[in-house]
């Protein structure tokens, strides 16, 4: 039950209650969102099959990191872990910083007290900062206690979350069944039904990020890992149902002055309080203030499950890396409850400055989450395909290949802005991704220098790809920055022209202002398309250059390896010859010494004829000469067998060496 609460709780958080009004309905409408979420859930289940296979193959802590290191090497494990850590920690930050937002919409200005300042147009108040700091500390402490406490909290909050949503939705159905299930229009009228469904489906990595978090704690399971897929299945289906219920609910009720949800969503920024959140407005319409309390408790429960679940996932990932001696051993020390307490403390300390940055800045970091999640899904699907191929498991080979292709599609979809997507990451998010990737190189250098077992640094392709990612992201950041600057400049030019018209008492009609705005938007769209095309061409040229550079580097390495092998072969051959000559010389010298000795004895015998003495002298001379040759061969073989080392000593041509 605890594992199910972890999977479901990590997948559904604050965003599930906000995104229907800000993203889902404007993109696709209620039914477009429902169909897209259903397809997205199916895609996540395909990836879930890959996780399930790998959890049974490698049932230890670390999740994707563990699978990648076992199947592809530690380089790949480090890269996947680097992005996964950001995913889990950023979700902690997003959920913690959502508590003040919930209070603002439901409690008004209650916590808008204390010191006040703003960052990136977001107002930050001292009381709200203390509220977030308290949540970070409280649920970090709950996770440190571990055991029954953390399991009970997670299960209770997950039940509150799901049944709170179910109660609100069922009451709405009982009052306005047809209107809730069939809110008109079912799809947005300005795009094809197929395209809007796809646009929602590709949000699946963001919507369901965390459903796989149980893979980080596999070695702590009190049940067989074979049951993990059923847990992820229920978690994903429950998460998908939550997103669909909230979207249908948001579209079913709107203020009386609006004819449908489209006009209401278009003017949503004009509202404050719970009216600015379509899900809360609809709940108030159907259940009054009681409904707001029920839904508010459900939202708070979703925030808490996200905090606790991602604390657990991030700490287990850090623990696994420390256990492999990639991080200091301090991180893998367990407390009396068997919890990696220091890893959780590190996450808490890292999180304490975050509330002071404001929600907007945190949103920039959270935008990078989708990229990190897709990288993890790419790795898990790839290693599942490889491992299944080795094991002869055809079904998992299929899911691994499908998951790999889909995850790569997700990655490109979110990385290239305004090409396939309705909206890309913010300019600041690209800069954060660049910074995090560069920090990844710094971290790699840190562990490479301390890798006593020489496990790191064996995949040149991986780090060339990482370098390409930095270059590519840098181009996209520059492109987005130029686009933002151009938008500001064109807006200033437009305001200047309007002011000049006013000086000459020329007032533009509403239609003329709309036409001018439409023209500016059209020109910005053309500029955006041109910049996207140029960026893709630049990316292709960069990719080609890196490919050629890597090919040359690979050829150089192969040549050096070949020369090294030839050198080793020549040395072995020379050593074999030297050994043979040494043995042969020894075998010949022994009888030759005997011959010389016997000749000497014979020469001492009395009565030898002069002719015999002459022959003996010639034999002796020939034997001595042959022994000299044999000794030279033996000395040469000994010299070749051992290397001679020469040392350096300071000296001068003008002083005699001592």
Give residue spans per PLM region.
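Transmembrane helix-loop boundary segments of multi-pass membrane transporters
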Residues: 24-28, 107, 111-125, 148-158, ...
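TM-loop-TM module centered on a large, flexible mid-protein loop between adjacent transmembrane helices
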Residues: 66-68, 73, 105-110, 231-308, ...
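Membrane-interface loop-to-helix entry segments
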Residues: 127-178, 232-236, 369-379, 392-404, ...
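Loop-to-transmembrane helix boundary motifs in multi-pass membrane proteins
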Residues: 1, 89, 126-133, 222-227, ...
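Primarily the dimerization/phosphotransfer
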Residues: 562-614, 618-631, 635-646
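Helix-loop-helix junctions that connect adjacent transmembrane segments
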Residues: 30-34, 111-127, 155-292
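A generic transmembrane alpha-helix motif of multi-pass inner-membrane proteins
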Residues: 395-551
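Extracellular loop-to-transmembrane helix junctions
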Residues: 16-120, 235-238, 433-435
